[in-house]
Design a protein with these regions (language model features):
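Short aromatic/hydrophobic "clamp" motif used to bind/position activated sugar donors
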Residues: 87
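Membrane-interface aromatic/basic loop that binds lipid-linked glycans or pyrophosphate carriers
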Residues: 271-326
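Short, acidic, metal-binding catalytic loop of nucleotide-sugar glycosyltransferases
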Residues: 24-33
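Glycine-rich, basic loop-to-helix element that forms the pyrophosphate-binding segment
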Residues: 66-82, 92
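Catalytic core of nucleotide-sugar-dependent glycosyltransferases
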Residues: 208-215, 221-249, 265-292
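Donor-binding/catalytic cores of nucleotide-activated saccharide
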Residues: 71, 92-202, 212-226
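A conserved acidic beta->alpha catalytic loop
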Residues: 25, 40-50, 68, 91
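Acidic helix N-cap motif at the loop->helix transition within catalytic regions
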Residues: 18-20, 45-53, 95, 99
Length: 326
């Protein structure tokens, strides 16, 4: 077993504005032999120069440069060179709060079979850092079955497939051949597979991750039809992974229902916030896959049986929210 507990993998591409703040937030709690692996995805700005200027003298900060292939490919390359027992995928424009490494260390010492470490996260606006809101909020805590953690997140509406949402034992990736496959939505299948393949999770109520929302991204980032179709394909692939899992039957049935409802809502909201019609293939998926689901509320019944009415009602809510965003 490696003496290195944690490898933090940071995929970087043209993030000269953010990389120092990100790495500095990690260095406050990471010392050798733990390591920070910066995977330079062929940046064309000053990212590499800044990393060399600030961190070339630190043994725990390592940088590798690869041909441009997207964040998922960069994470895969980072896993290949990582020497830690655990890996943590951190985005280069975000910030990690103090305490993550110390709690992880204590958990692994007390519960050595833990292979997934989950924590809360928040988001903040780049132009107004004092404006923050919860991102991932766990309702469970302590030692848990990872599939129960996933179900609870789906139920409370704070599940995200983002790979920065957990710390993972590296052998899980190796034994199950987990990889980030695509440039876009590359983490959907990976993250769900993580929750399904892991055997023991520790859930803390501490908020250790702070996601930066760049200026204008809430309202001004128009998404193309290709984006929505790729997002839909990621949903289908991930749902198929869930259906093929070997989870206990009642739990699997509950996870399938929760994941479908979560995904249907999310794809609808993505279109509404983009101020574009919900694609017909999404509506067809709701009509076809929704037939296997028994609604637990009026809102779920509308979503599954009359998606057009559900969309109309939610569109009024979204329009009001967009008007409030300065």
């Amino acid at each position: 077993m490696s003496d290195i507990l944690l490898s933090v993998i940071i995929p970087t591409y043209n993030v000269e504005k953010y990389i120092v703040e990100c790495v500095d937030s990690l260095l406050r709690q990471i010392s050798a032999p733990n390591e920070i692996i910066i995977v330079n995805d062929s940046s064309t700005d000053g990212t590499v120069a800044l990393v060399e200027q600030h961190y070339s003298h630190l043994p725990q900060v390592k940088m590798i440069t690869i041909a441009n292939g997207g964040a998922g490919n960069a994470r895969d390359k980072g896993v290949e060179v990582a020497q830690g027992q655990f890996v943590f995928f951190c985005d280069p424009d975000d910030v990690v709060a103090d305490g993550l490494v110390s709690e992880l260390t204590q958990v692994v010492e007390n519960y050595p079979d833990t292979d997934l470490f989950c924590f809360n996260s928040s988001a903040y606006r780049e132009d107004k850092p004092h404006i923050t809101w919860p991102k991932v909020r766990h309702s469970l805590s302590g030692i848990q079955r990872p599939q129960d953690v996933l179900l609870a997140l789906l139920h409370n509406g704070s599940y995200t497939s983002a790979a920065w949402n957990y710390v993972l034992r590296k052998t899980v990736i190796q034994q199950h051949h987990l990889r980030f496959v695509d440039r876009v939505h590359e983490d959907h299948n990976f993250t769900l597979s993580v929750f399904m393949k892991c055997k023991q999770a520790w859930v803390t109520q501490q908020t250790y991750y702070k996601q930066r929302i760049r200026s204008g991204s809430l309202t001004n980032s128009s998404k193309s039809p290709t984006f929505f179709f790729q997002r839909y394909n990621a949903f289908i692939a991930t749902f198929n992974t869930l259906c093929s899992s070997r989870a206990e039957s009642e739990l699997k049935k509950a996870l399938e229902k929760a994941y479908l409802i979560h995904s249907f809502r999310l794809m609808i909201y993505l279109s509404l916030y983009n101020q574009t019609p919900v694609p017909e293939y999404v509506l067809n998926a709701i009509r076809y896959l929704g037939r296997r689901i028994k609604a637990s509320s009026l809102k779920e019944w509308l979503l599954l049986n009359s998606p057009e009415t559900f969309i109309l009602l939610q569109s009024h809510k979204v329009k009001k929210e967009l008007k409030r965003v300065p």
